């Protein structure tokens, strides 16, 4: 996994993850915009295989925010979460009469950005 960060946003990328991008996107759509703790709880109880690499990338992004930017993990929110297609792994299955059928095993690239939530306490003046 490669990692990078900006001033108020920390990012993490998981590249060449085994699994199709569309199946990873359906999980990322559920956690986008949530807090770090809520996202971890949701990922723990989802019945999808793609939650494991997503959890690893999310924890890496939070570790980047904590170590590189000095942000508190309890105040972090998932600002962006994307899954893009990676190159397929090409495999071949032997078939009848000496033929071979191609099998493409999909890979994807997962990118997650976390940023600090801005808690605004607006007091009404009477």
From Swiss-Prot:
Signal peptide: none annotated. The keyword RNA-binding applies. SUPFAM superfamilies: Ribosomal protein L22 (SSF54843). Gene3D superfamilies: Ribosomal protein L22/L17. This protein binds specifically to 23S rRNA; its binding is stimulated by other ribosomal proteins, e.g. L4, L17, and L20. It is important during the early stages of 50S assembly. It makes multiple contacts with different domains of the 23S rRNA in the assembled 50S subunit and ribosome. The globular domain of the protein is located near the polypeptide exit tunnel on the outside of the subunit, while an extended beta-hairpin is found that lines the wall of the exit tunnel in the center of the 70S ribosome. Belongs to the universal ribosomal protein uL22 family. One of its GO terms (biological process) is translation. It holds the Pfam family Ribosomal_L22. Part of the 50S ribosomal subunit. It comes from Prochlorococcus marinus (strain NATL2A). It comes from the Bacteria. Keywords: Ribonucleoprotein, Ribosomal protein, RNA-binding, rRNA-binding. PROSITE patterns: RIBOSOMAL_L22. The keyword rRNA-binding applies. This is Large ribosomal subunit protein uL22. GO terms for cellular component: cytosolic large ribosomal subunit. One of its GO terms (molecular function) is structural constituent of ribosome.
